[in-house]
Amino acid sequence: MKYFKGEHLSYDCVVKDGRMLYMEIFKGHVLRDGMFDFWETVTHEVGSAQINNIVNWTAANLSGYTGCSCYETISDNMIEAHLRMGDIDRFMNRTLMQSIVKLYRDGSWEYQEKEYRKYYLFAVFAPYTQEVNINKKLLDQAEKDCVFFQLDSSDGELANPPAGKRIFALGTWDRDVGVRIRNKLINNINPPIPDEYVLPLYGYKSD
């Protein structure tokens, strides 16, 4: 098995009979050992050659398929392909979700993006053996301040990497807001998450 190094991208797509209707591209900022610091949308920053590779692969391999698809690449090498949505549901865009439902239901697509905005999806990981307690008021405030907020199961049964389980994920249109909320939650977790999981995080500052 080859080991790839380089830029990790996730392509969140909607297709009809293999024809690309919609594409959003996320860039993953790696933490270590399969864990990620955060993802950000880079759709308008990726070169046309890379995008065309995905479009052409989809047309060649999904010619009879209509619906969501998701691909992951490292340095232009495709490492995963799924017939499902990736992370675009975390935009909390009702119009987009309704358009996808309509595509599945009757094959029509009407969605038009009014304005492109950068989106950031932050995560926090901890050791599998760690119990995590977070003040409910802080969780409620985070849910209010974020576009998307998800507190993950404490048993770590999600598809987590070997080195740690994800504690929560939050999404915002403003990177600084995401950093601030994440730092606030991290610094109020009891017992504290080990430094090796939090010190390398983008923008992390202890209280």
Predicted regions span which residues?
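A structural supersecondary motif
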Residues: 69, 84-87, 147-154
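A short glycine-rich, hydrophobically flanked beta-strand micro-motif that places a catalytic Asp/Glu
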Residues: 62-76, 170
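Hydrophobic side chains in beta-strands
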Residues: 13, 75, 124-126
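ATP-dependent carboxylate/phosphate-activation module, predominantly the ATP-grasp catalytic core
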Residues: 12-59, 81-117
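Active-site flanking residues adjacent to catalytic metal/cofactor-binding acidic residues
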Residues: 1, 71, 79
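Peripheral (often C-terminal) accessory segments that flank ATP-dependent C-N-forming ligase machineries
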Residues: 102-207
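Domain-scale recognition of functional cores that engage charged ligands
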Residues: 5-8
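Short, charge-rich binding segments
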Residues: 2-3, 14
